[in-house]
Amino acid sequence: MIIMKGYSMEIEGNHAKARIREADISLKDSVNIAHHLRGMPLSRAKEIIDAVINKTYAIPYFRYLDSVSHRPGVGPGRYPVKAAKAFKQLLENVENNAEFKGLNTDNLVIKHIAANKGRMIKKYTPKAYGRAGANFKDLINLEIIVTEGSE
């Protein structure tokens, strides 16, 4: 039996939450995107994610910097398009949840955002002489909590 844990942070007052479980995206890209968006107004975060998908804005990397090239005006950074599409879905979902709860969607601020390692899919590829090579894929859980605040 799997006992599901809730969100990793509980907030008092008016807030909205959203979560994506077991997304097939890179953990390293997701951690860096979440770090960059934390504390940002939701409208600005959506603009940044759209620009990353169009490859006009690079996400600055603060972790997993090995062989990450510098981008103009950013430092080490990349354009993680696949992870950005998952974050776009997450941001739209939390905005709809906030609208349903009656919050003012123009003043939403990202209070908490996290990317955590989820379930691992184990695959084995047959090789020569009866051996098998392991191919493990980590799935990622994303969560976000927004509150009403001033920009």
Swiss-Prot record:
Which segments does the entry list as coiled coil? none
Keyword set, alphabetical order: Ribonucleoprotein, Ribosomal protein, RNA-binding, rRNA-binding
Q: Which InterPro entries match?
A: Ribosomal_uL22, Ribosomal_uL22_euk/arc, Ribosomal_uL22_sf
Query: Which Gene Ontology molecular-function terms are recorded?
Result: rRNA binding; structural constituent of ribosome
Which residue positions does the secretion signal occupy?
A: none
Superkingdom of the source species = Archaea
Task: State whether keyword Ribonucleoprotein applies.
Answer: yes
Q: Name one GO biological process term.
A: cytoplasmic translation
Give a GO cellular-component term. cytosolic large ribosomal subunit
Oligomeric and partner information: Part of the 50S ribosomal subunit.
Family, per entry = Belongs to the universal ribosomal protein uL22 family.
Q: What does this protein do?
A: This protein binds specifically to 23S rRNA. It makes multiple contacts with different domains of the 23S rRNA in the assembled 50S subunit and ribosome. The globular domain of the protein is located near the polypeptide exit tunnel on the outside of the subunit, while an extended beta-hairpin is found that lines the wall of the exit tunnel in the center of the 70S ribosome.
Indicate what this protein is called per its UniProt record: Large ribosomal subunit protein uL22
Give the originating organism.
Thermoplasma acidophilum (strain ATCC 25905 / DSM 1728 / JCM 9062 / NBRC 15155 / AMRC-C165)
Phylogenetic classification of the source organism: Archaea, Methanobacteriati, Thermoplasmatota, Thermoplasmata, Thermoplasmatales
State the gene name recorded for this protein.
rpl22
